[in-house]
Curated annotation (Swiss-Prot):
Signal peptide: 1-22
PANTHER family listed in its UniProt record: FERULOYL ESTERASE C, PTHR38050
Principal location: secreted
Gene: faeC-1
Cellular compartment(s): Secreted
GO biological processes: xylan catabolic process
Family: Belongs to the faeC family.
Entry keyword set: Carbohydrate metabolism, Hydrolase, Polysaccharide degradation, Secreted, Signal, Xylan degradation
GO cellular component, one term: extracellular region
Name of the molecule in the record: Probable feruloyl esterase C
Length: 272
């Protein structure tokens, strides 16, 4: 009896070795994929899928959602209209990431009754059943209403997403839950006349609290300086940072050619 117990214990311990840790690998790993680049239809809605050029079905990839703004659409994100394609993240990913641009209802993310969060859930389920994804490495970013939807995911899906980057967002897609910690980056223009700067600060403060960070004053650059000031909160269980930049309600902070938001977002995601 004792040898049997010992043998079972050894098997249980062996399952915890790094080579056997498969819980973060999606069920699509090892499969020949049926999904391909382009527009995917799902439950009466649609999204754009972009795979790495050399997709390997045995390699677990990061998964990044790029969410469009009010009046925008998934093509704006994928093609780079008023922003760099995929918010500038695809070039920085260098083949490490699967990108998804969902299409909002009525060119927005009202998330009535949680329908947009449910749509994101359904996309994740479909993609990860077919493709190889590191399930501990999901991210979301977006501008304006896309930022609001990213914030909503931070509230309701903090255990499913590793980090979000909210560009000029507001509480416009709801905040169901909103008590769990998640890595949170906020980027906001000090002269935003659509979703005010102080509101963006308030979004970050929720996760300062959730993540147990030490309170700190958020710095801001002088108006007209064309510069930015970053605040990294200390003592957090998961990182929280906020970048204030000299600008308004801009889909590409400091201009489409600026590396500010793409660099900050990608580095934050990878360090989260």
């Amino acid at each position: 009896m004792l040898p049997t117990i010992l043998y079972s214990a050894i098997l249980a311990l062996s399952a915890l070795t790094p080579s056997a840790l498969a819980e973060t690998r999606s069920s699509g790993c090892g499969k020949h994929p049926s999904l391909a680049n382009g527009v995917i239809h799902l439950n009466g809605r649609e999204y754009i899928l972009k795979l790495p050029d050399r997709y390997d079905n045995n390699h677990a990839y990061h998964l990044v959602f790029g969410l469009h703004w009010r009046g925008g659409n998934m093509q704006n994100v994928a093609n780079g209209e008023s922003i760099q394609p995929w918010y500038g993240l695809e070039t920085r990913a260098q083949g490490s990431t699967i990108f998804i641009a969902p299409n909002g209802k009525n060119a927005g993310w009202a998330n009535n009754g949680g329908e947009d969060v449910a749509f994101i859930d359904a996309i994740i389920k479909q993609v990860e059943a077919d493709l190889c994804v590191d399930q501990s490495s999901r991210f979301a970013t977006g501008f304006s209403w896309g930022g609001g939807m990213s914030y909503s995911l931070a509230c309701s899906r903090a255990k499913q997403f590793k980090a979000v980057s909210v560009l000029s967002g507001g509480v416009i897609s709801g905040c169901d839950g909103g008590h769990d910690p998640i890595a949170y980056l906020g980027i906001h223009g000090i002269n935003d006349g659509v979703l005010p700067f102080n509101g963006g600060v308030g979004l970050a403060q929720k996760f300062v609290q959730n993540n147990g960070c030490q309170q700190a004053n958020i710095g801001a650059p002088p108006s007209g300086s064309k510069s930015s000031v970053r605040t990294d909160f200390k003592g957090c269980s998961k990182p929280v940072s906020f970048i204030a930049y000299d600008g308004g309600h801009d889909s590409a902070p400091l201009g489409v050619g600026s590396s500010l938001a793409p660099d900050a977002t990608w580095k934050f995601f990878m360090a989260a």
